[in-house]
């Protein structure tokens, strides 16, 4: 996936109210950017960090800039949670995600469960329901999800277990949008309920996949599969 051009480099001043970030651009201008990430962004919102912003030409937008990348522990991290669904779809279509090949159709945002929309539904033959999660927290060499308590994420795991019980395929897909982290594991210290449900889901037949993304100011793309440490 090619990122918007041009991107504007700067330095993070602060992130606040979840969806706002003040950034000093390289020319000295201070702007407020939209932060497209509702998590805690632990490890990715340190004041003074190098960042890249995209700029919208939509005059109706309240905030013209969107925060896209941050330098975290020497690696560019993609913090835009709107991108992973597109990355996974692109990875399926170009053959990178071998585990999800062989389906005739890919449909986004299909209703299922209780007032939910699955990120991707793969159809023909059979059906595969795919929930995609963005991972940017890395500690001790392991990528961790979630970075904040997520009742929505817990609900998705329950719904994936139900589609598997009904005979369909269910997949929880972790996209690690940074270059470090050799595996993915549930962040039990942050959301122990999510960790318990992930392990329960895997035992029930939900497939847990994780891929690392190459993240640069020019592009983001899935590159390699990582193990998911979801055992007891």
UniProtKB/Swiss-Prot annotation:
One of its GO terms (molecular function) is DNA binding. It holds the Pfam family SfsA_N. InterPro entries: cNMP-bd_CS, cNMP-bd_dom, SfsA, SfsA_C, SfsA_N. It comes from the Bacteria. Signal peptide: none annotated. Belongs to the SfsA family. This is Sugar fermentation stimulation protein homolog. It comes from Geobacter sulfurreducens (strain ATCC 51573 / DSM 12127 / PCA). The lineage of its organism: Bacteria, Pseudomonadati, Thermodesulfobacteriota, Desulfuromonadia, Geobacterales.
